[in-house]
Amino acid sequence: MHLLLWLLLLARLCRPEFICEVSKVTSQVEVNCDNKGLKALPPGLPGDTAILHLAENPLGAFSTALLGPLTRLAQLHLRQSQLTQLQVDGMLPRLETLDVSHNRLKSLPSLGRALPALTTLDASFNELVALSPGTLDGLSHLHELYLRGNKLKTLPPRLLAPTAQLRKLNLADNRLTELPPGFLEGLGELDTLYLQGNWLRTVPKGFFGDLLLPFTFLHGNPWSCDCEILYLARWLRDNSNNVYLWKEGVEAKATTPNVDSVRCVNWKNVPVHTYQGKDCPSPMDGGDMDYDNYDDEDEKLPGVEAPATRAVVSFSTHTKAHTTHWGLLYPTFAYPDHQMAYLSSTLELTEKQTMFPSTLGPIMPTTTPEPTTPPTTLEPTTTPTTPEPTTPPTTLEPTTTPITPEPTMPPTTLEPTTTPITPEPTTPSTTPTTPQPATTPTTPQPATTPTTPQPATTPTTPQPTTTPTIPELPTPPTTPEPTMPPTTLEPTTTPTSPTTTLILSESNTFLGIPELTSPCTTSEYPIVPSLVHLPEAHEVARGTSDSSRNHRLFNPDLCCLLPLGFYILGLLWLLFASVVLILLLTWAQHVKPQALAMATYTTHLELQWGKQVTVPWAWLLFLQGSFPTFRSSLFLWVRANSYVGPLMAGRRPSALSLGRGQDLLGTVGVRYSSHSL
């Protein structure tokens, strides 16, 4: 018997004891082997282990293949385990958290194939110098990545591309000197970014993209305030409530914003968001700031006018089917220093037009030249019409010429006259040309017979010594109805068909212009062929201008009288309503209440009031019978209306209405709730 006991005791001593603590938390088995001096994975781990702690053990190296039997393992903690090598040659399909912080790892293997469900990776405070581009491949469910306290100097540009669901990124306390462009691209759910304690001097333009980033830590970097920092300075101004100062042991949500913590190292230690970069090129000077567009796209930029569209119409007055050339409606932004225009490939000539802010521009036979330059003639259009060689025309329709109004006349409707142009016959040896400025010379059409140059489409050029230049009208010119008398030509000449250039303005939208009547900037627009009929265009323009001038509603006197009339009618109506209300109140005060009241009926209800009995409270404890009954008598006056007049003669208020009865009824109601009245 004693021998058997000794054998059992010896067998127990030979069997190794399981030194880890096993507990169950929220239906998950948790095994705690922290600080047990383990150099290898302890045997006898429960197969349903979900949380395994192996921190503060001198493991040296670790392989996930040892955890193959633990199919339910969700968390693995290897903090401060003196790891120098981590192998992921065994697949853990349910592992969500891997903590290898405070070790001696110099590189990280590719984790996506062995740990497809990983959501949190903590590799802080190791000796990582660089990361391979495929380190995070396959970690599509990764939410938190902690790489703080390493020796990283650069990062692969596409390192975070596989982690589209990343929410927290900690790169603090490294040796990063630059960040790759597009590093945060595709991280739409990123809300916390730690970049403090690095060697960053600037960030690439467009680095933050359109991310919201509610919690950002950028302090502790030697930010160099020069022209390259303007992007970060503007981003800090636009997101001043999202920049925080990190404190040890304090959650990001528990801290307060501190945008002043991001400071320049070379500019008197001022906050970066206050740096304006006065000597740096601005977008208006051709510099590319590449700012993120946080505002609306239609926001007005300084010094930029709103886009406008114009159309140039060119048609022939010689043929019945008029050919029209419409300009491409390209929007143009006019800057203070220069102008930009989008030209068509078929464009042969452009003319600087003066745009007026009118919703429907009238059809003008010509454009008003600028006051500083002499009147010029237009160059020929891309599709000039040629005269018919078989039948020489007998008459030539001249071009219309608007006459400059007299200085004493107000800028009202002008009735211009027409100046017939009679081409003079020329000899074959000479070819006359129309005098034009040196900037826009006109080439006459060559012909074997004596020809005449094309008449200009602008107003006829007067002699410089007798006629001054035509000044620019202060108001948009309207299209008058020209009268065009025929002109008989010499039989020896063959006139060419003149061309007339009209300008049809489309609906223009001008943003940021204080007065709609002020002229806008000038820009150049191309010409593209189209079709239009000259007589119809003249009739539409003339009818529009005549109807707008002759309509009664557009009379300025009538427009001013209408509000005044409505104002007077409102005062009269208010006065009438006040008088009616005063009369009603006066009549109501003089009417006697007795006249309005109906007949009064009085009904007497008498209730017998029993004898009042006083019973001490002590007796009630021993009283086995029923409680005494109390009765009250009330006098009710029933009337046809709610009006209660004075008491009639011979009646006085009873004691019940003076307070005693009210106290009595209240006492009865409280003490004896079964009593009813």
From Swiss-Prot:
Task: Show the disulfide pairing.
Answer: C20-C33, C225-C264, C227-C280
| Extracellular-side positions | 17-564
Subcellular localization is given as: Membrane
List residues, modification Sulfotyrosine.
Y291, Y294
One short Pfam name that applies is: LRR_8
Could you tell me where the Pro residues compositional bias lies? 471-485
Instruction: Locate the compositionally biased regions of type Low complexity.
Output: 362-385, 393-403, 411-421, 427-470, 486-499
Task: Tell me the segments the record calls region Disordered.
Answer: 359-499
Q: Which keywords does the record carry?
A: Blood coagulation, Cell adhesion, Disulfide bond, Glycoprotein, Hemostasis, Leucine-rich repeat, Membrane, Phosphoprotein, Repeat, Signal, Sulfation, Transmembrane, Transmembrane helix
What function does the entry list?
Answer: GP-Ib, a surface membrane protein of platelets, participates in the formation of platelet plugs by binding to the A1 domain of vWF, which is already bound to the subendothelium.
Query: PANTHER family from the xrefs?
Result: IG(IMMUNOGLOBULIN) AND LRR(LEUCINE RICH REPEAT) DOMAINS (PTHR24366), PLATELET GLYCOPROTEIN IB ALPHA CHAIN-LIKE-RELATED (PTHR24366:SF158)
What quaternary arrangement does the UniProt entry report? Two GP-Ib beta are disulfide-linked to one GP-Ib alpha. GP-IX is complexed with the GP-Ib heterodimer via a non covalent linkage. Interacts with FLNB. Interacts with FLNA (via filamin repeats 4, 9, 12, 17, 19, 21, and 23).
The name on file for this protein is Platelet glycoprotein Ib alpha chain
Which source organism does the UniProt entry give? Canis lupus familiaris (Dog)
Gene name of the encoded protein:
GP1BA
